[in-house]
Amino acid sequence: MESSILERCFSQSKKEGRIALMPFIMAGDPDVNTSAEILIMLEKKGADIIELGIPYSDPLADGPIIQKAASRALNSGTSPKSVLEMLSTLKTKLSVPIILFTYSNPLLNYGMEEFCIDASKAGAAGLVVPDLPLEETEKLSSIALSKNLDLVLLVAPTTPKERMRKISQRSNGFTYLVSVTGVTGERSALENRVQLLINELRGFSSTPVAVGFGISDTKHVIQVKRWGADGAIIGSALVKRISNATTGQEAEEAGKFCSELYKATSL
């Protein structure tokens, strides 16, 4: 089977001796136009793949920082449709692959097939749906793949081994390894068992492994690279920088942080 755009991205960063840098931002925080500027800036400052969150009112997997960002985005009128429309306008300006991070409820409300069609037209490369159980991924995966979208599945430290094997073999693009038990958020240290989980996933499939939830600084990026991960996903720490930025300086602040993180990808 031909490799996907995401898999090619991981191959490229590996060739360069780097771990892929994968920042996450919440679309519409503070508004969709600023999100568009931030996406362009992140690509400019070294992002290999960007995760774009679609705001939802009940984000079970997310900690307080991302929950607040989702609230701000919803209050500014952001919807799945407005996110995809914004993404469409960037097709000629962005070449970095975009993964849409959405919960199953907004996806089902939109219509699974319609969402995949519109996401693909808007130029997205993949989807992450954190609350979709493995047993329900088959239909979405087949629709997504038919529209050239990878459906990325998540593995947590609490996932039983046999289930972990199934997830890693069914995940497309990469396997999303959740580094901690619980919700997204900044952590001061990463647990050593993340390394064991990376090794276990390596034994199950050749799909790249990206680590997220709790990666918040250059030290963590270096750590997961040494542990053998293919990608480092940085969410809450970046979302916090954006929310703390002076109005009009959000893209600038995001770019500075991305530059710092990028330097760590080859260490």
Swiss-Prot record:
Catalytic activity: (1S,2R)-1-C-(indol-3-yl)glycerol 3-phosphate + L-serine = D-glyceraldehyde 3-phosphate + L-tryptophan + H2O
Group of enzyme by EC: lyase
Active site: E51, D62
GO CC list: cytosol
The entry's keywords: Amino-acid biosynthesis, Aromatic amino acid biosynthesis, Lyase, Tryptophan biosynthesis
GO terms of molecular function: tryptophan synthase activity
InterPro entries per record: Aldolase_TIM (IPR013785), RibuloseP-bd_barrel (IPR011060), Trp_synthase_alpha_AS (IPR018204), Trp_synthase_suA (IPR002028)
Lyase is among the record's keywords: yes
Enzyme Commission no: 4.2.1.20
Protein's pathway: Amino-acid biosynthesis; L-tryptophan biosynthesis; L-tryptophan from chorismate: step 5/5
CDD domains in UniProt: Tryptophan_synthase_alpha
UniProt signal peptide: none
Family in the record: Belongs to the TrpA family.
Assembly information from the UniProt record: Tetramer of two alpha and two beta chains.
Role this protein plays: The alpha subunit is responsible for the aldol cleavage of indoleglycerol phosphate to indole and glyceraldehyde 3-phosphate.
Record protein name field: Tryptophan synthase alpha chain
